[in-house]
Amino acid sequence: MSKKPLDFLRIYDWHKTEAMNKISKLDFERIIPKHFSKEIKNKHLSVKITGNWKIWKLTDEGEGQYPIFKCIVEDGFLKIKNECGNKKYSLDNAWIKICTKIKYDNENGKDIYSIDEKNLTLYSVNNSFNSKYKNNIVDAFLDNLLIACIEDNIKDLNKFFKLYKVKTAIKEDLSLLGWDTGYSTSFTHVNKTIENQQNYPKQFKYESEGPYNIDISGEFDSWRLTTGSDGQNVNFICPIKNGEFNFLGTEYKFSQGEQVNIQLKLKYLNIEEPTFEDSTSLNDGNQVDLIVKTDEDENENPPVTIIKVVLLGEIDAIGKMLLEGTFREWFNENIDAFKQIFSSFLLEDTSKNPDFQWLKPTKAYYGVASAEPIDGKPDLDSSVFSVMSMVEDNKNDKPSHTVDGRILDAVNNESAFGIRTPLFVKKWLIAGLEMMQIGKLEDFDLINNGMGFINNKKLLFGTFENADGEDVPAYVEKDNFRLEITNNQLKIEITDIYWQQSRRLTGHVMYSQYFDLELRSGTDITGAEYKNILIPVENSEPTLVVNISQDEFDIWGDIVGEIVGGIVVGIVTGYLGSILGKGVGKYLEKFLTKTSGGRWVLKMNKEMYDYLNNLFKGDRRVFNEVAIDEIELISTLGTSQAISTIANTPTNFASKIWVNKSKFIGGLIGGSVGSVIPSVIIKSIDAWDKQNYSVLPSINAFVASSVGSVKWPDTSEFKIESAELNGIFLLGGKLERYEK
């Protein structure tokens, strides 16, 4: 499966679209012809429909690119004429619900939504006829003839649809759309399971008494998922292996390549006796299985919708309608024979590792997303079948079956597991914050979007020895420290750290650093193999801005150049020597720019970064040793006293930044096992420093706890191959089958 660039995700809100658009009857009549009529016949039978439209409406039942219209008839009739006579059915106030596919275009900056006439999809979801007449044959005649009338005026339907202002939302990054977790696989994988387990009905047989002399029998080949639907609607192809259809004295032989395309919904069923175990939990929860829904939905739509019957041989229009009506009745009566379990959840389960309890689901949902065809053929590898969940009894305010269809392309694999970023922040990124030891956890709040933390009070950041040989406090004011995820990167940002650097100089420094999360496997410096280690990696030079007042600039050559040089060189290289040479201050002076507020600003750039790294070589291992000593204080002094002791222990600005960075990295590595135990963090910092990666904890235990409560029916195990931040915390991998 080739990796594709991710387009924007367009989320259609048909509830809001329906509620916020009220199309008048006058507008409707201006576009849609009032009268409709259609007739078909053969030597045995003629069927005619005629009537007048009352109104068409867009409903709120659509999913993804597939809106549903309700077309209401004012008056009319269906007339069936055969050798036994005539029969007339009233259409007064009858209705039909139809589904079609729309496409999106942008013309001169304006969003345009229209029915895809070139690749037209148009089928009946439900109607009022069957409940009234209880006759699937009459139902099929009415459905097909009304759809034919609408299809004849498809351009008018398109004009009518364009009266609606379609409400959508755009997501650039991947999204779980309010769900805490999502576990996805491809249609291809699901189809392999269906084929192997063969839980679909193998045979079909149906006879009907009455004037049409219908009987049908035959065998199905393996049913399979196909594209053409989104959300809760799941499309299947039911290939016909062999069989025959007899109607009105005519025999039609089925052949290979013919099929019935149907649409189903699924539901979760409580299971009293669990059928699988989660090796990472106590298995004290309740199991639910995702199976075919066999009754009407909340909109009273039947469990099975016949989208189309594909035939290769010669059969007239009446015969095909009779066949469709017969299949409609058979499928709705026999769909409970489709025993496939699509997924199973253990809900409300207890994790063996309390630090991973937050990964255990408490509510389950499902959804599908169809990928666009490739060369006219369904793209089953990129089409997504997903099971979503909430954890810790969290609530999804707008629960939806909508699935981000880009997720498999993003991992370039057959399966993916995602965690909503604010949940990742609260449960994993917080370990990095806590281990930095710049404040107690209660000194920080979640930022409004849930993507990180911000300090809620003034913090004593550290104690620095200044140019006069004095130990002075360095502060960070409220809201000036942020640890967050932005642009799919981890970011540490301190807007202003300030301290009295000399009698005439107050140091003001803005510092930020970005990190990527990388999943690494390989051989470490000792020759030992390691696998699936998640490590934060600096992805660029840090951002450093030093502010200098006009008075301070006047003494640049004597004092400020050396002081600022020490800060910059220390941050960039880790070199903490007291003698830099006059050339460094002179070199940095050329990067000073004056602001409109009368201050001078020194911003580090790549040229400066490379120049200083070539000039100075610091021993960064010293900082890791200090970081380890500071983490050990948690065990001896406790968290609060350790933070206070560290903040009041004299150091310098550069050392403080480097040590905090080491502790942050150690905290995140420790998060792989859900732990902020000092011994684990110390071990992580030491191994990371020495590039002894085989000693670091892998992400495997986390992955096992993440997916352990969810089971695909083919007893497959998720084998992780990638991890990244991409709107969500995203794990990609393969599903490897194993024997029970």
Curated annotation (Swiss-Prot):
Transferase in keyword set: no
Gene induction: Part of both a high- and low-molecular weight complex with other proteins from the ptox and cry loci. Encoded in the ptox locus, possibly in an ntnh-orfX1-orfX2-orfX3-pmp1 operon.
Cysteine disulfide links: none
Cross-referenced Pfam families: Clostridium_P47
Additional note from the record: P.bifermentans strain Cbm (subsp. malaysia) is toxic to Anopheles mosquito 3rd instar larvae and less toxic to Aedes aegypti larvae.
Family according to the record: Belongs to the TULIP P47 family.
Full protein name: Protein OrfX2
Phylogenetic classification of the source organism: Bacteria, Bacillati, Bacillota, Clostridia, Peptostreptococcales
